[in-house]
């Protein structure tokens, strides 16, 4: 059975939504630029040999609608290339990599593009979740319960299933973070410390040249060039973040300093069979060892990385001790902290260059972005095995184990 190997990655800088550096770029234009950058790194590959373009997008509507994956293929002049658009919210472009893995293992193709995009700035044109009066009335009581809890002080999370009630499938991510923090006993100070850690590590990694290794500069409509992420800030300290007000509840613990911002960005990964890579004389960057996906209550979705990672590790025949570097998407410190603790991850192996709290989290981009970052990190720090994982809106988790090959 063939192995699935990664031969190229590319990503854009990550912009702040609505006010940042990429706010004037369309998602299709940005995605095409980044896919072309990834393909340019493997000139040996004939584009006509690509079997499918699978594009992850968290909210595929508005400018991100019309099956964006196929739009991008045509935009790049590849009418022969099929294209699909996949949403699994925050893990959309890890899902597309998983689909490439499965297709290669099944012998149904040799070369796939797994890409991801989210341009939240362009949501002013609409998105797939913003249409009015579309929620199922079945969840009305659960939504009202979420709203009531958000206004109360001192509320702790209780699984509604234990009372014969349905959980809130539409719950806002910030409310799930507050629920999880209380349920798992995470404090505001711990969350702030983790947020500061992310910014400080990103600041150090920028100085060391780590982040610039993976960023493809992007040209804006006005001709200016963006070559770095908007999010990282120098000199962030506990004193500086301590006074920030909570975002989601009067007595909340989630602040702008301990969760990710809203962002714009795109990333791409070129995945092929090891037999095709050998045929082309390519040395792969990494091998996809295994993946995992899990579900749990939507109201505590942030704990999703735990079971998903355990699945992926079991399928890889590895333990967490075998993993050299771990990337957990930093949607909220409130969920990364209990996830890494439950998994038994050494903090010295976790998000060692900073994470999404600093660099950002464009939903559909994140899976492919973290794959590229993890490969970059395994090379930069000379390590072998990496684990990528994230929580997923709606109460899910996803994970992938990779092995560095070059």
Q: Where in this protein do the model-derived segments appear?
A:
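N-terminal extracellular/periplasmic Venus flytrap/periplasmic-binding protein-like
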Residues: 11-13, 24-33, 44, 152-153, ...
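Conserved catalytic cysteine-centered active-site region
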Residues: 25, 57-112, 168-171, 238-261, ...
């Amino acid at each position: 059975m063939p192995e699935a190997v990664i031969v190229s990655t590319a990503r854009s800088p990550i912009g702040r939504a609505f006010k940042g550096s990429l706010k004037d770029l369309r998602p299709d234009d940005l995605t095409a630029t980044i896919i072309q950058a990834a393909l340019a790194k493997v000139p040996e590959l004939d584009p006509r040999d690509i079997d499918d373009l699978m594009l992850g997008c968290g909210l595929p509507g508005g400018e991100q609608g019309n099956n964006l994956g196929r739009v991008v293929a045509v935009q790049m002049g590849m009418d022969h290339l099929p294209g699909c658009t996949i949403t699994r919210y925050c893990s959309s472009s890890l899902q597309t990599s998983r689909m490439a893995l499965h297709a290669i293992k099944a012998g149904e193709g040799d070369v796939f593009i797994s890409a991801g995009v989210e341009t939240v700035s362009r949501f002013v044109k609409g998105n797939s979740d913003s249409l009015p009066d579309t929620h199922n009335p079945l969840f009305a009581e659960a939504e009202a319960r979420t709203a009531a809890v958000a206004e109360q002080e001192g509320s702790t999370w209780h699984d509604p299933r234990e009372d014969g009630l349905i959980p809130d499938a539409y719950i806002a991510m910030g409310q799930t973070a507050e629920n999880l923090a209380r349920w798992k006993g995470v404090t505001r100070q711990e969350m702030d410390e983790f947020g500061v850690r992310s910014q400080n590590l990103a600041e150090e990694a920028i100085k060391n040249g780590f982040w610039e290794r993976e960023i493809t500069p992007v040209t804006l409509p006005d001709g200016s060039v963006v070559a770095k992420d908007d999010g990282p800030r120098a000199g962030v300290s506990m004193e500086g973040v301590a006074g920030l007000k909570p975002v989601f509840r009067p007595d909340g613990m989630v602040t702008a300093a301990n969760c990710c911002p809203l962002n714009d960005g795109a990333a791409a990964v070129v995945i092929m069979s090891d037999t095709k890579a050998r045929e082309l004389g390519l040395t792969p960057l990494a091998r996809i060892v295994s993946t995992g996906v899990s579900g749990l209550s939507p109201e505590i979705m942030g704990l999703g990385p735990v079971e998903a990672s355990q699945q992926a590790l079991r399928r890889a025949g590895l333990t967490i001790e075998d993993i050299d570097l771990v990337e957990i998407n930093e949607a909220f410190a409130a969920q990364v902290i209990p996830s890494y603790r439950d998994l038994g991850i050494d903090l010295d192996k976790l998000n060692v260059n900073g994470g999404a709290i600093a660099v950002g989290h464009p939903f559909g981009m994140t899976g492919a972005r973290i794959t590229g970052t993890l490969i970059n990190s395994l090379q930069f720090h000379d390590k072998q095995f990496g684990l990528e994982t994230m929580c997923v809106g709606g109460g899910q988790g996803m994970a992938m184990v990779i092995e560095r090959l070059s």
